Every structure is written in structure tokens, then in C-alpha cells.
């Protein structure tokens, strides 16, 4: 199966005068539809690697290929549309007054027809079990519910790649398992590639 992410000899440091690299000569690939867990302690370069893949940071050396295209300053915005990211604290991602408005926000930026937008919002909220909460304020949801809404907002955009950057670290063990199970179902149903960043080795094995 063809690789949708290919990283070759990637190196990066936040300051040029640093003695050490935050990411040093890293290479890996992810096949379409796979689930890759990147596990490591805080400060090991996990999130930095993901930000390089998403084009939020620029590598000092090496190559990043997304779906057969070499990531560059010319195509970074186009390739970024293929990637959806969910972060540790979903409160930083919410922009809508209601759950429904928040999931619709990204679709509005894409200029989708209103009926198609409503359909995608409903489908995405249904997928994560949050359709009954569509009129709630995101701030009034539990931690697990907030993460489900954040995932729905990403899934509605139909990216080829979903990146979870410590997205379950603020949840209790049961909430983590439920969220991972939900993402696993979405991955299978939509042939989505998932990259999960975590420091929890046990959590990285749940989806297997």
C-alpha cells in the first residue's frame, strides 16, 4: 500500500546556536489507512515532528512527502488541507457559540453550500456520539465531550490524515479508551490515516 506520509532524514532545532537538535535525522513512513503512534517522554520531539509535517514549522534539513508531494512553501497550504489536528486542550480550538456552530466553522471557510454543510455537521456529530448536544455551549461540556466535538470538527473537513497531539492526556482512563475506540471506528469507516502523539505506552496499544 502506498505511503501517505514519508519523512526522510528530518532535522530541526528551534535556535540555530543550539548544541542539540530537537528533531535529529528522523525517518519514517505511514501507509494510507494506518494508525501510527509516536511515543516518547515530554521534550522528546514528538509534537515538534508533527508540527513539521503540518508545515507549522520549517525543517532545517530533510524531506516531508504528503500523498506523493514534497512539502514546500509553495504547496504548504494545499497539503495542510489534507491534515486535521486535535490538540491536548480543545478549549483553544473552539470558536462557535454552540457545538453545531463550532463544527460548521471550518466548512464555512471552505464555502460549502448550506445544505451540504448541515449534512456534514450532523454526520460528524453522529459519528462521535454528540449529535444530541449540538445546541450546547462547548465550554459547558465535559473534557471527553469537548474532545469528541473537536474531532467532529476535523472529521467534517474530511482530511486524509488525522493527527491527535496528546488529545487524550486530560481524560480519565475510561474516557481515553472510549475516545480512541471512536477514532478507530472513524478510521475504518473513512479510510483515514491516524497519527497519535502520546507519552502513554499503554494508550498507544489500545487501537491494535
What residue spans do the PLM features occupy?
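The feature captures the beta-strand-to-loop junction immediately N-terminal to the Walker
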Residues: 39-41
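Conserved catalytic motifs of ABC-family nucleotide-binding domains
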Residues: 158
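Conserved ABC ATPase "signature" region
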Residues: 115-133
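Conserved small/polar residues in nucleotide/adenosyl-binding loops
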Residues: 206-208
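Conserved ABC ATPase signature
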Residues: 137-141, 145
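Catalytic Walker B motif of ABC-type/P-loop ATPase nucleotide-binding domains
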Residues: 162-165
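Helix-to-loop junction immediately C-terminal to a conserved catalytic motif
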Residues: 54
Amino acid at each position: 500500500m502506498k505511503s501517505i506520509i514519508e519523512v526522510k532524514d528530518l532535522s530541526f532545532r528551534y535556535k540555530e546556536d543550539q548544541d542539540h537538535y530537537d528533531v535529529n535525522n528522523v525517518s519514517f513512513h505511514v501507509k494510507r489507512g494506518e494508525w501510527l503512534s509516536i511515543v516518547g517522554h515530554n521534550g522528546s520531539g514528538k509534537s515538534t515532528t508533527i508540527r513539521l509535517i503540518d508545515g507549522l514549522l520549517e525543517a532545517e534539513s530533510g524531506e516531508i512527502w504528503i500523498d506523493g508531494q514534497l512539502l514546500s512553501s509553495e504547496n504548504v497550504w494545499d497539503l495542510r488541507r489534507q491534515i486535521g489536528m486535535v490538540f491536548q486542550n480543545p478549549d483553544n480550538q473552539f470558536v462557535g457559540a454552540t457545538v453545531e456552530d463550532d463544527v460548521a466553522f471550518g466548512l464555512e471557510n471552505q464555502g460549502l453550500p448550506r445544505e451540504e454543510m448541515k449534512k456534514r455537521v450532523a454526520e460528524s456529530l453522529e459519528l462521535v456520539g454528540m449529535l444530541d448536544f449540538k445546541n450546547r455551549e462547548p465550554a459547558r461540556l465535559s473534557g471527553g465531550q469537548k474532545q469528541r466535538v473537536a474531532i467532529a470538527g476535523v472529521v467534517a473537513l474530511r482530511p486524509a490524515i488525522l493527527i491527535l497531539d496528546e488529545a487524550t492526556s486530560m481524560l480519565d482512563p475510561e474516557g481515553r479508551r472510549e475516545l480512541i475506540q471512536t477514532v478507530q471506528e472513524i478510521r475504518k469507516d473513512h479510510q483515514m490515516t491516524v497519527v497519535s502523539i502520546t507519552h502513554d505506552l499503554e494508550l498507544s496499544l489500545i487501537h491494535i
